[in-house]
């Protein structure tokens, strides 16, 4: 879909900020070693990723800033928003579109004051609709739930059932699923209500050609099964 119209969980506000259904590519420095970060993200973008998150908590600050600035330029050229994990100040300095906050990552309201009304701010809600309700009230732009499958990135994260994706659509915000997602198990999450599939290892654990092909496969899943792309696909009962 070239241009979205407000529908379901995608308000005019969300669309104006650049949010759309699809693959949410999340970087991992343990997978993207040896200077592979930029080429890997470029491959994901070629494959159709609609949102990118830079997640790096251990590198020195100057290195993080340089990587974030480079990613911001790549994403800007592709017309795709870049989100910074857990660091509103880094998001501001590198010119990213916004920030993603976990439950221990600080105040959403403070991040909003730092970044402004135009910024995209996402919130981790685990499998808890009460957390989602609070994030919604605090002005989150999207709500993230998971983990749905075993995850090597965050093996200790609380588990979630697909039904939380359906239930969370009551908030009228884009719904993100995360945790062990691959091209083989993503379809069911989209059918359950996921607007975005946030993928780490299931995307970036491979060479550049593999990353691009996996991204294309995720994009096809949305084209086939997300209601904003195809309302003719029968839904599971």
What are these regions (language model features)?
Residues 103-109, 147-170:
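Flexible, gly/pro- and Lys/Arg-enriched active-site loops
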Residues 99, 197-198:
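Paired acidic/hydrophobic, glycine-rich loop segments that form the ligand-binding mouth/hinge
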Residues 148-149, 195, 202-203:
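Flexible glycine-rich beta->alpha loop in the catalytic core of nucleotide-sugar glycosyltransferases
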Residues 160-163, 180, 184:
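Short amphipathic alpha-helical segments
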Residues 1-108, 113-141, 167, 172-175, ...:
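Conserved N-terminal beta1-alpha1 strand-loop-helix module at the mouth
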């Amino acid at each position: 879909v070239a241009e979205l119209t407000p529908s379901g969980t995608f308000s005019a506000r969300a669309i104006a900020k650049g949010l759309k259904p699809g693959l949410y590519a999340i970087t991992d420095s343990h997978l993207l070693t040896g200077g592979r970060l930029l080429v890997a993200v470029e491959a994901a973008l070629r494959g159709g990723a609609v949102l990118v998150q830079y997640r790096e908590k251990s590198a020195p600050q100057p290195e993080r800033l340089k990587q974030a600035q480079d990613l911001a330029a790549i994403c800007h050229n592709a017309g795709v928003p870049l989100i910074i994990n857990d660091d509103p100040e880094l998001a501001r300095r590198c010119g990213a579109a916004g920030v993603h906050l976990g439950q221990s990552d600080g105040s959403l309201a403070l991040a909003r004051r730092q970044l402004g009304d135009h910024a995209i701010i996402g919130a981790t809600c685990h499998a808890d609709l009460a957390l989602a309700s609070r994030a919604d009230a605090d002005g989150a732009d999207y709500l993230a739930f998971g983990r749905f499958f075993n995850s090597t990135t965050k093996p200790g994260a609380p588990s979630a059932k697909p039904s939380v994706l359906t239930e969370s659509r009551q908030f009228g915000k884009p719904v993100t699923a995360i945790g062990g997602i691959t091209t083989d198990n993503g379809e069911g999450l989209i059918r359950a209500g996921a607007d975005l599939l946030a993928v780490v290892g299931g995307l970036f654990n491979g060479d550049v050609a593999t990353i691009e092909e996996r991204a294309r496969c995720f994009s096809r899943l949305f084209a086939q099964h997300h209601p904003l792309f195809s309302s003719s696909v029968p839904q599971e009962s």
